[in-house]
Amino acid sequence: MALSKDKKTEIIKKFQKNDADVGSVFVQVAVLTEEIKLLTEHLLKNKKDFISKRGLYTKVSKRKNLLNYLKQNDLNAYRNLISELELRHS
């Protein structure tokens, strides 16, 4: 259910701005998006797993807050990230 270390490293390398960048908004949103996809697949199979559902809601909320921050501070970067991750914007 959790992201494997290799997959997380791959996502970080794809979205980081430099070698030391592991915590920028871009990286955090990309990692959260992948975790949300995994949790969604899990919840389709396990409909009564309410603890995982709560975790999903938490991750979606955190990603929403990060995207709102990015939208307010750098609109072009926000649009690029949304299109690259294939997310809908609000």
Swiss-Prot record:
Name under which the protein is recorded: Small ribosomal subunit protein uS15
Record GO cellular component, one term: cytosolic small ribosomal subunit
Pfam families, per the entry: Ribosomal_S15
Cross-referenced PROSITE patterns: RIBOSOMAL_S15
NCBIfam families, per the entry: S15_bact
GO biological process: translation
SMART domains given in the database record: Ribosomal_S15
Quaternary data: Part of the 30S ribosomal subunit. Forms a bridge to the 50S subunit in the 70S ribosome, contacting the 23S rRNA.
Transmembrane feature ranges: none
One of the record's GO molecular function terms: structural constituent of ribosome
Function: One of the primary rRNA binding proteins, it binds directly to 16S rRNA where it helps nucleate assembly of the platform of the 30S subunit by binding and bridging several RNA helices of the 16S rRNA.
Keywords: Ribonucleoprotein, Ribosomal protein, RNA-binding, rRNA-binding
Family listed: Belongs to the universal ribosomal protein uS15 family.
CDD domains noted in UniProt: Ribosomal_S15p_S13e (cd00353)
Cited Gene3D superfamilies: 6.10.250.3130, S15/NS1, RNA-binding (1.10.287.10)
